[in-house]
UniProtKB/Swiss-Prot annotation:
Membrane topology classification: Single-pass type II membrane protein
Naturally occurring in which organism (per UniProt): Mus musculus (Mouse)
Superkingdom of this protein's organism: Eukaryota
PROSITE patterns: BRICHOS
Protein name (Swiss-Prot/TrEMBL): Integral membrane protein 2A
Residues that carry a glycan: 166
S-S pairs: 160-219
Family, similarity comment: Belongs to the ITM2 family.
Pfam families named among the record's database cross-references: BRICHOS
Domain BRICHOS: residue ranges: 133-227
Amino acid sequence: MVKIAFNTPTAVQKEEARQDVEALVSRTVRAQILTGKELRVVPQEKDGSSGRCMLTLLGLSFILAGLIVGGACIYKYFMPKSTIYHGEMCFFDSEDPVNSIPGGEPYFLPVTEEADIREDDNIAIIDVPVPSFSDSDPAAIIHDFEKGMTAYLDLLLGNCYLMPLNTSIVMTPKNLVELFGKLASGKYLPHTYVVREDLVAVEEIRDVSNLGIFIYQLCNNRKSFRLRRRDLLLGFNKRAIDKCWKIRHFPNEFIVETKICQE
Protein backbone atom coordinates (compact mmCIF):
# COMPACT_ATOMS: atom_id res chain seq x y z
CA MET A 1 0.00 0.00 0.00
CA VAL A 2 1.20 3.38 -0.96
CA LYS A 3 0.69 6.27 1.47
CA ILE A 4 0.20 9.84 0.24
CA ALA A 5 1.36 12.36 2.83
CA PHE A 6 0.67 16.17 2.90
CA ASN A 7 3.37 18.32 4.36
CA THR A 8 1.89 20.74 6.86
CA PRO A 9 3.43 24.24 6.94
CA THR A 10 5.81 24.80 9.69
CA ALA A 11 5.63 27.69 12.11
CA VAL A 12 8.43 29.48 10.29
CA GLN A 13 6.61 29.29 6.97
CA LYS A 14 3.43 30.64 8.55
CA GLU A 15 5.30 33.55 10.02
CA GLU A 16 6.92 34.43 6.66
CA ALA A 17 3.56 34.30 4.90
CA ARG A 18 2.00 36.57 7.51
CA GLN A 19 4.83 39.11 7.15
CA ASP A 20 4.43 39.13 3.35
CA VAL A 21 0.70 39.82 3.66
CA GLU A 22 1.28 42.61 6.17
CA ALA A 23 3.93 44.22 3.93
CA LEU A 24 1.56 44.11 0.94
CA VAL A 25 -1.27 45.62 2.96
CA SER A 26 1.05 48.31 4.33
CA ARG A 27 2.22 49.32 0.83
CA THR A 28 -1.36 49.43 -0.43
CA VAL A 29 -2.49 51.61 2.46
CA ARG A 30 0.45 54.01 2.01
CA ALA A 31 -0.29 54.28 -1.71
CA GLN A 32 -3.93 55.12 -0.98
CA ILE A 33 -2.93 57.71 1.62
CA LEU A 34 -0.45 59.40 -0.74
CA THR A 35 -2.98 59.39 -3.56
CA GLY A 36 -5.56 61.02 -1.31
CA LYS A 37 -3.10 63.71 -0.23
CA GLU A 38 -2.18 64.50 -3.83
CA LEU A 39 -5.83 64.72 -4.74
CA ARG A 40 -6.40 67.13 -1.89
CA VAL A 41 -3.30 69.23 -2.68
CA VAL A 42 -4.01 69.75 -6.37
CA PRO A 43 -7.32 71.59 -5.89
CA GLN A 44 -5.68 73.76 -3.23
CA GLU A 45 -2.98 74.79 -5.70
CA LYS A 46 -5.61 75.58 -8.33
CA ASP A 47 -7.63 77.62 -5.86
CA GLY A 48 -4.50 79.55 -4.81
CA SER A 49 -3.56 80.30 -8.43
CA SER A 50 -7.06 81.61 -9.20
CA GLY A 51 -6.94 83.83 -6.13
CA ARG A 52 -3.63 85.32 -7.14
CA CYS A 53 -4.97 86.06 -10.64
CA MET A 54 -8.01 87.81 -9.19
CA LEU A 55 -5.84 89.93 -6.89
CA THR A 56 -3.54 90.83 -9.79
CA LEU A 57 -6.47 91.88 -12.00
CA LEU A 58 -7.98 93.88 -9.15
CA GLY A 59 -4.68 95.66 -8.57
CA LEU A 60 -4.30 96.47 -12.25
CA SER A 61 -7.85 97.86 -12.29
CA PHE A 62 -7.05 100.20 -9.41
CA ILE A 63 -3.83 101.34 -11.12
CA LEU A 64 -5.66 102.00 -14.40
CA ALA A 65 -8.40 103.94 -12.61
CA GLY A 66 -5.75 106.00 -10.83
CA LEU A 67 -4.02 106.82 -14.10
CA ILE A 68 -7.30 107.93 -15.70
CA VAL A 69 -8.30 110.13 -12.77
CA GLY A 70 -4.78 111.53 -12.44
CA GLY A 71 -4.59 112.30 -16.14
CA ALA A 72 -7.91 114.11 -16.01
CA CYS A 73 -6.72 116.21 -13.05
CA ILE A 74 -3.47 117.08 -14.80
CA TYR A 75 -5.35 118.08 -17.96
CA LYS A 76 -7.79 120.20 -15.96
CA TYR A 77 -5.30 122.06 -13.81
CA PHE A 78 -2.12 122.20 -15.87
CA MET A 79 -3.19 122.44 -19.52
CA PRO A 80 -3.17 125.97 -20.96
CA LYS A 81 -6.50 127.71 -20.46
CA SER A 82 -8.08 129.72 -23.25
CA THR A 83 -11.28 131.65 -23.80
CA ILE A 84 -13.05 132.34 -27.07
CA TYR A 85 -14.13 135.97 -27.54
CA HIS A 86 -16.43 137.50 -30.15
CA GLY A 87 -16.38 141.14 -31.18
CA GLU A 88 -17.25 143.61 -33.89
CA MET A 89 -15.99 147.06 -34.84
CA CYS A 90 -17.08 149.46 -37.55
CA PHE A 91 -14.74 151.83 -39.35
CA PHE A 92 -15.01 154.78 -41.69
CA ASP A 93 -13.20 154.13 -44.96
CA SER A 94 -12.20 157.45 -46.49
CA GLU A 95 -11.18 155.67 -49.70
CA ASP A 96 -14.64 154.23 -50.22
CA PRO A 97 -16.40 156.10 -53.08
CA VAL A 98 -19.62 156.16 -51.05
CA ASN A 99 -17.94 158.29 -48.39
CA SER A 100 -16.58 160.75 -50.95
CA ILE A 101 -20.03 162.05 -51.90
CA PRO A 102 -20.39 165.66 -50.66
CA GLY A 103 -23.07 166.04 -48.02
CA GLY A 104 -23.58 162.30 -47.71
CA GLU A 105 -23.80 160.51 -44.40
CA PRO A 106 -20.69 158.55 -43.40
CA TYR A 107 -20.84 154.85 -44.15
CA PHE A 108 -19.22 152.51 -41.65
CA LEU A 109 -18.01 149.04 -42.61
CA PRO A 110 -18.22 146.26 -40.00
CA VAL A 111 -15.34 143.94 -39.11
CA THR A 112 -16.12 140.82 -37.09
CA GLU A 113 -13.61 138.63 -35.25
CA GLU A 114 -13.43 135.56 -33.10
CA ALA A 115 -10.38 135.43 -30.83
CA ASP A 116 -8.84 132.53 -28.92
CA ILE A 117 -6.67 134.36 -26.38
CA ARG A 118 -4.25 132.31 -24.25
CA GLU A 119 -2.58 134.50 -21.68
CA ASP A 120 -0.53 131.63 -20.23
CA ASP A 121 1.04 131.01 -23.65
CA ASN A 122 1.23 134.75 -24.45
CA ILE A 123 -0.55 134.19 -27.73
CA ALA A 124 -3.67 135.36 -29.59
CA ILE A 125 -5.33 133.34 -32.35
CA ILE A 126 -7.70 135.45 -34.45
CA ASP A 127 -10.35 134.08 -36.81
CA VAL A 128 -11.62 136.58 -39.39
CA PRO A 129 -14.73 135.18 -41.11
CA VAL A 130 -15.89 135.95 -44.62
CA PRO A 131 -16.81 139.65 -44.57
CA SER A 132 -20.33 140.68 -45.52
CA PHE A 133 -19.77 144.14 -46.96
CA SER A 134 -16.13 144.45 -48.01
CA ASP A 135 -13.58 143.05 -50.43
CA SER A 136 -11.22 141.59 -47.82
CA ASP A 137 -10.35 137.91 -47.42
CA PRO A 138 -11.20 135.59 -44.53
CA ALA A 139 -8.13 134.62 -42.54
CA ALA A 140 -6.67 132.94 -39.49
CA ILE A 141 -4.07 135.07 -37.70
CA ILE A 142 -1.63 134.14 -34.93
CA HIS A 143 0.18 136.75 -32.85
CA ASP A 144 2.88 134.85 -30.92
CA PHE A 145 4.50 137.15 -28.36
CA GLU A 146 6.90 134.43 -27.19
CA LYS A 147 8.37 133.96 -30.68
CA GLY A 148 7.80 137.58 -31.74
CA MET A 149 6.03 136.46 -34.93
CA THR A 150 2.73 137.06 -36.70
CA ALA A 151 1.31 134.52 -39.14
CA TYR A 152 -1.51 135.16 -41.62
CA LEU A 153 -3.29 132.22 -43.21
CA ASP A 154 -5.35 133.44 -46.15
CA LEU A 155 -8.28 131.02 -46.19
CA LEU A 156 -9.08 131.69 -49.85
CA LEU A 157 -5.55 131.11 -51.12
CA GLY A 158 -4.49 128.54 -48.55
CA ASN A 159 -1.07 130.20 -48.12
CA CYS A 160 0.71 131.33 -44.95
CA TYR A 161 2.47 134.70 -44.66
CA LEU A 162 4.85 135.43 -41.80
CA MET A 163 6.46 138.56 -40.44
CA PRO A 164 7.93 139.92 -37.18
CA LEU A 165 5.27 140.85 -34.63
CA ASN A 166 4.51 144.58 -34.73
CA THR A 167 3.96 145.39 -31.06
CA SER A 168 3.15 149.01 -31.90
CA ILE A 169 -0.06 147.78 -33.55
CA VAL A 170 -0.90 144.47 -31.87
CA MET A 171 -2.10 144.55 -28.27
CA THR A 172 -0.81 142.03 -25.74
CA PRO A 173 -3.14 139.12 -24.94
CA LYS A 174 -4.05 140.70 -21.59
CA ASN A 175 -5.04 143.99 -23.25
CA LEU A 176 -6.94 142.15 -25.97
CA VAL A 177 -9.00 140.41 -23.30
CA GLU A 178 -9.89 143.82 -21.86
CA LEU A 179 -10.77 145.13 -25.33
CA PHE A 180 -13.14 142.26 -26.09
CA GLY A 181 -14.65 142.68 -22.64
CA LYS A 182 -15.46 146.32 -23.47
CA LEU A 183 -16.93 145.33 -26.83
CA ALA A 184 -19.13 142.70 -25.20
CA SER A 185 -20.39 145.06 -22.48
CA GLY A 186 -21.05 147.95 -24.85
CA LYS A 187 -18.73 150.28 -22.94
CA TYR A 188 -16.59 150.87 -26.01
CA LEU A 189 -18.00 152.69 -29.04
CA PRO A 190 -17.08 150.39 -31.94
CA HIS A 191 -16.82 153.19 -34.54
CA THR A 192 -13.17 153.69 -35.24
CA TYR A 193 -10.61 154.39 -37.96
CA VAL A 194 -8.40 152.23 -40.13
CA VAL A 195 -4.61 151.85 -40.22
CA ARG A 196 -3.14 150.42 -43.42
CA GLU A 197 0.01 148.35 -43.78
CA ASP A 198 1.42 147.46 -47.19
CA LEU A 199 3.36 144.18 -47.27
CA VAL A 200 5.11 142.15 -49.93
CA ALA A 201 5.86 138.41 -49.98
CA VAL A 202 9.60 138.34 -50.68
CA GLU A 203 10.67 134.71 -50.26
CA GLU A 204 9.28 131.26 -49.57
CA ILE A 205 9.91 129.62 -46.18
CA ARG A 206 10.56 125.90 -46.54
CA ASP A 207 10.63 124.96 -42.85
CA VAL A 208 8.32 126.44 -40.18
CA SER A 209 9.16 123.95 -37.42
CA ASN A 210 11.34 126.48 -35.56
CA LEU A 211 8.61 129.14 -35.37
CA GLY A 212 6.72 127.65 -32.43
CA ILE A 213 4.08 124.96 -32.12
CA PHE A 214 1.12 127.26 -32.87
CA ILE A 215 2.50 128.69 -36.11
CA TYR A 216 3.72 125.22 -37.05
CA GLN A 217 0.22 123.79 -36.65
CA LEU A 218 -1.22 126.64 -38.73
CA CYS A 219 1.31 126.66 -41.57
CA ASN A 220 2.71 123.13 -41.76
CA ASN A 221 2.22 121.50 -45.18
CA ARG A 222 1.22 124.86 -46.67
CA LYS A 223 3.15 127.25 -48.85
CA SER A 224 4.64 129.85 -46.52
CA PHE A 225 6.20 133.19 -47.39
CA ARG A 226 8.12 135.87 -45.53
CA LEU A 227 6.60 139.35 -45.55
CA ARG A 228 8.40 142.68 -45.71
CA ARG A 229 7.05 146.20 -45.58
CA ARG A 230 6.94 147.71 -49.03
CA ASP A 231 8.60 150.98 -47.96
CA LEU A 232 11.64 149.07 -46.64
CA LEU A 233 12.36 147.28 -49.91
CA LEU A 234 15.11 149.03 -51.87
CA GLY A 235 14.75 149.00 -55.62
CA PHE A 236 11.33 147.44 -55.41
CA ASN A 237 9.56 147.21 -58.76
CA LYS A 238 5.87 147.88 -58.27
CA ARG A 239 5.10 146.62 -61.75
CA ALA A 240 6.38 143.18 -60.79
CA ILE A 241 3.43 142.75 -58.45
CA ASP A 242 0.39 141.26 -60.11
CA LYS A 243 -1.63 139.92 -57.16
CA CYS A 244 -2.75 141.80 -54.05
CA TRP A 245 -5.42 141.14 -51.45
CA LYS A 246 -6.52 142.55 -48.10
CA ILE A 247 -7.21 141.22 -44.63
CA ARG A 248 -9.08 143.49 -42.22
CA HIS A 249 -8.87 142.80 -38.49
CA PHE A 250 -8.64 144.68 -35.19
CA PRO A 251 -5.63 143.77 -33.03
CA ASN A 252 -6.12 147.08 -31.24
CA GLU A 253 -8.74 149.78 -30.69
CA PHE A 254 -8.64 150.48 -34.42
CA ILE A 255 -8.97 148.47 -37.62
CA VAL A 256 -5.85 147.28 -39.42
CA GLU A 257 -6.05 146.68 -43.16
CA THR A 258 -3.20 144.36 -44.09
CA LYS A 259 -2.51 144.45 -47.81
CA ILE A 260 -0.37 141.57 -49.06
CA CYS A 261 1.10 141.57 -52.56
CA GLN A 262 2.91 138.73 -54.32
CA GLU A 263 4.45 138.21 -57.73
